[in-house]
């Protein structure tokens, strides 16, 4: 059993047992297959915490880990909102939200690309500012990135689920706290928890720090009603030891990472489970 499997199953059980239904409301989300309202059971403010002795990835089902990393590179390295660039990587998870111009509007990578931070008289974006400050001002309590821009929320195809990171350097270790306003536990959470841990490992490597703790905070923690049956099946499955994540140690520049610089070794997992998408 992995740390992630244990915490994940605990939260799923709590949601199914004690979650509050939103069926009394006219919800925004609709089922992609038939357009009917996609209702949820939810609880609020849950935290997952990892000591980084293992990579947090589920073993009770197959997680498309390469797809998760490609999405991460699209947002954090390319700082892109162009879905066609993601399609070129063979990833289509954002196709449902693609606008007429091929983008997701002013969401995710668009916010990271904005050069709105001052650094030695030059305007830089959030990622470059973070990398510089972690290396040159490690004791700062201001190592934060933010995707939630109130002035541009109406220009986003989808407002960001994971919206904030805060980084801490303590005794030579790089700790990461991630905040998600909302997490779909069947589909979004397994991706987000894994990919932001990969980001922590990438940035620790290029800034020269050891890995510290990884904390993932969720505001609205929910399960869609059509996902419950398969989640119950998933929780009963055999659990395996965590795999090892290899990241090419030769990469010293954040922008030099490619998908070929990552390998997930000895990833044993249950079969893939199908969960319908709510849009």
From Swiss-Prot:
Its EC number is 2.1.1.45. It is found in: Cytoplasm. Pfam families: Thymidylat_synt. Pathway: Pyrimidine metabolism; dTTP biosynthesis. (6R)-5,10-methylene-5,6,7,8-tetrahydrofolate binds at residues 184, 278. It comes from the Bacteria. Gene3D superfamilies: Thymidylate synthase/dCMP hydroxymethylase domain. One of its GO terms (cellular component) is cytosol. It catalyses: dUMP + (6R)-5,10-methylene-5,6,7,8-tetrahydrofolate = 7,8-dihydrofolate + dTMP. DUMP binds at residues 141-142, 181-184, 192, 222-224. Keywords: Cytoplasm, Methyltransferase, Nucleotide biosynthesis, Transferase. The active site is at 161 (nucleophile). Homodimer. Belongs to the thymidylate synthase family. Bacterial-type ThyA subfamily. Catalyzes the reductive methylation of 2'-deoxyuridine-5'-monophosphate (dUMP) to 2'-deoxythymidine-5'-monophosphate (dTMP) while utilizing 5,10-methylenetetrahydrofolate (mTHF) as the methyl donor and reductant in the reaction, yielding dihydrofolate (DHF) as a by-product. This enzymatic reaction provides an intracellular de novo source of dTMP, an essential precursor for DNA biosynthesis. This is Thymidylate synthase. It comes from Bacillus mojavensis.
């Amino acid at each position: 059993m992995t740390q992630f499997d244990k915490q994940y199953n605990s939260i799923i059980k709590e949601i199914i047992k004690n979650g509050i239904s939103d069926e009394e409301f006219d919800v925004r989300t609709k089922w992609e297959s038939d357009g009917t309202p996609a209702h949820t059971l939810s609880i609020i403010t849950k935290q997952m915490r990892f000591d980084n002795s293992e990579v947090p990835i589920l073993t009770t089902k197959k997680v498309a880990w390469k797809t998760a990393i490609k999405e991460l590179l699209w947002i954090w390295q390319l700082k892109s909102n162009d879905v066609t660039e993601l399609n070129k990587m063979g990833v289509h998870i954002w196709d449902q939200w693609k606008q007429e111009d091929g983008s997701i509007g002013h969401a995710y990578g668009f916010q990271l690309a904005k050069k709105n931070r001052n650094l030695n008289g030059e305007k830089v974006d959030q990622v470059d500012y973070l990398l510089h400050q972690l290396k040159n001002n490690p004791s700062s309590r201001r190592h934060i990135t933010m995707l939630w821009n109130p002035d541009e929320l109406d220009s986003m195809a989808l407002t960001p689920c994971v919206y904030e990171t805060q980084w801490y350097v303590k005794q030579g270790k790089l700790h990461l706290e991630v905040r998600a306003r909302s997490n779909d536990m069947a589909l979004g959470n397994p991706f987000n928890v894994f990919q932001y841990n990969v980001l922590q490992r990438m940035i620790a490597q290029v800034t020269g720090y050891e890995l510290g703790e990884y904390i993932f905070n969720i505001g609205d923690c929910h399960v869609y009603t059509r996902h419950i049956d398969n989640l119950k099946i998933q929780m009963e499955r055999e659990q395996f030891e965590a795999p090892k994540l290899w990241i090419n140690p030769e990469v010293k520049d954040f922008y030099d990472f490619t998908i070929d610089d990552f390998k997930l070794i000895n990833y044993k997992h249950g079969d893939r489970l199908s969960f319908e998408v709510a849009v």
